[in-house]
Swiss-Prot record:
Protein name according to UniProt: Large ribosomal subunit protein bL35
Domain of life: Bacteria
Natural source organism: Leifsonia xyli subsp. xyli (strain CTCB07)
Pfam families from the UniProt entry: Ribosomal_L35p
PROSITE patterns, sorted: RIBOSOMAL_L35 (PS00936)
Family, per entry: Belongs to the bacterial ribosomal protein bL35 family.
GO terms, molecular function: structural constituent of ribosome
Keyword terms, alphabetized: Ribonucleoprotein, Ribosomal protein
GO cellular component, one term: cytosolic large ribosomal subunit
Keyword field contains Nucleotide-binding: no
């Protein structure tokens, strides 16, 4: 049976930490930033841990 290909969109959006958690960039930092407060922008700029329910599918797309 052939190998499963890595999902090209997923490999650009997610990364797996050394402990196995799946990280993603929080949405909302692309445009209309002048109407968002600095506290909100700081919170949105941080990476976010993907919930374990979704991380299972992300790992499968990444071939892990």
């Amino acid at each position: 049976m052939p190998k499963q290909k890595t999902h090209s969109g997923a490999k650009k959006r997610f990364k797996i930490t050394g402990s196995g958690k799946v990280m993603k960039q929080q949405a909302g930092m692309r445009h209309n930033l002048e109407v968002k407060g600095s506290d909100r922008k700081r919170r949105l700029n941080a990476d976010q841990v993907v919930p374990e329910v979704d991380a299972k599918f992300v790992r499968r797309m990444l071939g892990k």
